[in-house]
Amino acid sequence: MVCTRKTKTLVSTCVILSGMTNIICLLYVGWVTNYIASVYVRGQEPVPDKKLEEDKGDTLKIIERLDHLENVIKQHIQEAPAKPEEAEAEPFTDSSLFAHWGQELSPEGRRVALKQFQYYGYNAYLSDRLPLDRPLPDLRPSGCRNLSFPDSLPEVSIVFIFVNEALSVLLRSIHSAMERTPSHLLKEIILVDDNSSNEELKEKLTEYVDKVNGQKPGFIKVVRHSKQEGLIRSRVSGWRAATAPVVALFDAHVEFNVGWAEPVLTRIKENRKRIISPSFDNIKYDNFEIEEYPLAAQGFDWELWCRYLNPPKAWWKLENSTAPIRSPALIGCFIVDRQYFEEIGLLDEGMEVYGGENVELGIRVSEISHTGLSSAPMMVWQCGGSVEVLPCSRIAHIERAHKPYTEDLTAHVRRNALRVAEVWMDEFKSHVYMAWNIPQEDSGIDIGDITARKALRKQLQCKTFRWYLVSVYPEMRMYSDIIAYGVLQNSLKTDLCLDQGPDTENVPIVYICHGMTPQNVYYTSSQQIHVGILSPTVDDDDNRCLVDVNSRPRLIECSYAKAKRMKLHWQFSQGGSIQNRKSKRCLELQENSDMEFGFQLVLQKCSGQHWTITNVLRSLVS
């Protein structure tokens, strides 16, 4: 699942991706944030205590840093891990697997456990030794236990999507669904195997399915892909195989908690245009303990990575912890009326592998207009439906340490995000291009044919994206004042770029150009220079502005710098100088042999140094 929670360490962000992806730590190594995001998303932590509330020398240094970065990425991300029998175990002390578990294991046991961990991204060794029917703590708000539900509710088909999942994890997902869903409500379970190469998911899984179906004929269906289609198209495959009035689309590394189904089916029975997400808790990847997560809505940033949000103010005012939480988007696992899902266009099967489809669905439902509709409502919010998170429906989900699903997740998410932007986001599509640091014209990225999706939007009579931002996602920060963006380079040393430096400091630096988030620069019509991430919501204070502080360049939170009337306005024209309006000092490079790349940023009397930025949207007037 893709949703983030904010941290303030050198490991700057962890992103959780839906479906067959998982948790990836976005590492800022050697002052470089490797922005290869994948499944929890940069986001505001919901309130935890209230559930309601010289050239050779330079080259060698670069190589050393890149080598270190590569090693970290291999350990933490491992885009394409070897099979269990092929994986070479790292030194035990280097693996996060043994930080809180496994000290009592023999060396051989640790070796086996580590091989499986490298392959699956979670502790399959431990999972194989846990009962399939293990109990879970009831983490629902206390009021949920007193709720009553209609006797007559629609049946549900539960769909599990997987590729190379550990068999015990998959079986525990199935078992918990069967044990904790009332039998009269659970019509069937559908397993979508996206072309797994793991042999135990063939013969052994077939034996299990045959055993269950021997007692309940046809209860478990298996859909096997002949090639890997990716999470998005796998979900659609599962929907096509489903026959119940309601379809629940889930990852295959979850465990259902007691009473999860009745609240969901009740809300859909009341209004079939509701798309529902349960509230998620965490199954820790190392020791499989259940970690309670605060209640949260689900949103996204301008790269369209999912992120957890604090519930809206209107929800807090209810003072009712059992009330549904209105949510701008979905993180990936959701429950939907089967026919309604088809009416609004399912998922965009022109997307690749993973990412963006959950955001697209949430926006689409929101923008659909009710006017003139017979059977086809628009994209959930824009198109007449709604998205809710239910506090009384709780499901635990494994956040993997790394994912086995794709070698380049970021490229897929970026491409999919641009499809969403071009179809649904109107003039705000520029924000997606800016966040990804991509030219808005001739981006060089083939997003495929979007004709059918544009026709769908027209057919569904969806509202504008501006309406969505104002009415559904008012927390989303708008950046209509940005007139230039990209990386900022000085003519004196063009292989170095302005960089935000370590997260823990406020001193900008110059660093070898890599084009990732720490080097993103945004120049506004009010002559401010933002460096680093585009803060997604108005509640975040992540935006940092370049400021002249006692003749030294510093990065200060923009809102604070403005309130304190600091020197944060800069005259800049493409190929010209960057001069502070008040102090008249220029941002320049100065040779310094003590610095890593031989140069440092200074503010001094202008000497004629020239700066260029990658993308200019409007004329820059100095």
UniProtKB/Swiss-Prot annotation:
* GO aspect biological process, one term: protein glycosylation
- Report the membrane topology from the UniProt record: Single-pass type II membrane protein
Note the superkingdom of the native organism: Eukaryota
**Residues annotated as region Catalytic subdomain B?**
324-400
- Identify the residues that the record assigns to the Ricin B-type lectin domain, covering every copy: 484-614
Map out region (Catalytic subdomain A) in residue numbers: 153-267
Q: Which residues lie on this side of the membrane: Lumenal?
A: 36-622
Molecular function GO labels = carbohydrate binding; metal ion binding; polypeptide N-acetylgalactosaminyltransferase activity
Q: Which SUPFAM superfamilies match?
A: Nucleotide-diphospho-sugar transferases (SSF53448), Ricin B-like lectins (SSF50370)
Show the disulfide pairing. Answer: C144-C392, C383-C462, C497-C513, C545-C558, C586-C606
EC number(s) per entry: 2.4.1.41
- Entry text on domains: There are two conserved domains in the glycosyltransferase region: the N-terminal domain (domain A, also called GT1 motif), which is probably involved in manganese coordination and substrate binding and the C-terminal domain (domain B, also called Gal/GalNAc-T motif), which is probably involved in catalytic reaction and UDP-Gal binding.
Physiological role = Catalyzes the initial reaction in O-linked oligosaccharide biosynthesis, the transfer of an N-acetyl-D-galactosamine (GalNAc) residue from UDP-GalNAc to a serine or threonine residue on the protein receptor.
Q: Which family does it belong to?
A: Belongs to the glycosyltransferase 2 family. GalNAc-T subfamily.
Provide the protein name: Polypeptide N-acetylgalactosaminyltransferase 18
Q: Which gene codes for it?
A: Galnt18
